Design a protein with these regions (language model features):
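Non-heme Fe(II) oxygenase metal-center motifs and adjacent flexible, charged/small-residue loops
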Residues: 1-216
């Protein structure tokens, strides 16, 4: 209950991360009744899995996808593909609630008209992390990235144009939506190891889904 109250108190606040980068505090909270069932349906159709990087490391974050294109990694590299490599079937359709929330969040951050075609769903268990990286597998860097946080709080790292630039640390709470694009589109970013905890709705996990325009 205390976590829910704190999340609610943050709703409507905008935290600026850069010239064209924002965190919209609590923006996803009014959408939860639609988001959570849709999320469960996506995971039921395309289960979460731990993928291996080209270097042979298994990612600590479990992931899946929905939408026309899904992000994957294996020994051959990072790429988007229209089908689930485990089944050969198309990824689940992007839920309408995901797409509409994304369009509205993007517009609030100055990116009206954003139309995502790819949604990467990440599940962080305690201890899972995401190393600093750039999102460079998309064909068009003109579209923003919209990232929705649900469940346990995480410490988001938002760096600069080079990996060696010291990143800012920004807490992301249940319902927060981060949006970055334009001059900030290729900034390095990551997530520190998730702290142990128990969220009243989602338990011992953080769910993050990130929407992009990956195709032409």
């Amino acid at each position: 209950m205390q976590a829910d109250l704190f999340d609610a108190e943050q709703t409507g606040i905008r935290t600026r991360l850069g010239e064209q980068a924002w965190v919209l505090r609590g923006f996803a909270l009014p959408w939860l009744d639609a988001l959570l069932p849709a999320l469960r349906a996506v995971i039921a159709q395309a289960p979460l899995r731990h993928m291996a990087t080209p270097g042979g490391f298994t990612m600590s974050v479990a992931l899946t996808n929905c939408g026309a294109l899904g992000w994957t990694t294996d020994a051959h590299g990072y790429r988007y593909r229209p089908d689930d490599p485990q089944t050969g079937l198309p990824w689940p359709p992007m839920p309408q609630a995901f797409a509409q929330l994304t369009r509205e969040a993007a517009a609030q951050a100055g990116f009206a008209g954003f139309d995502p075609d790819a949604c990467l769903v990440n599940r962080y268990a305690p201890g899972a992390r995401m190393s600093l990286h750039q999102d460079k597998n998309e064909r068009d860097f003109g579209a923003p990235i919209v990232s929705v946080s649900l469940g346990l709080p995480a410490m988001f790292l938002f760096g600069g144009a080079r990996r060696d630039e010291r990143p800012a640390r920004i807490p992301l709470l249940h319902g927060d939506v981060a949006v970055w694009g334009g001059v900030d589109r290729l900034r390095y970013h990551g997530v520190m190891p998730l702290a142990e905890g128990q969220h009243p709705l989602l338990g011992r996990q953080r769910i993050n889904f990130t929407l992009r325009r990956a195709g032409a």
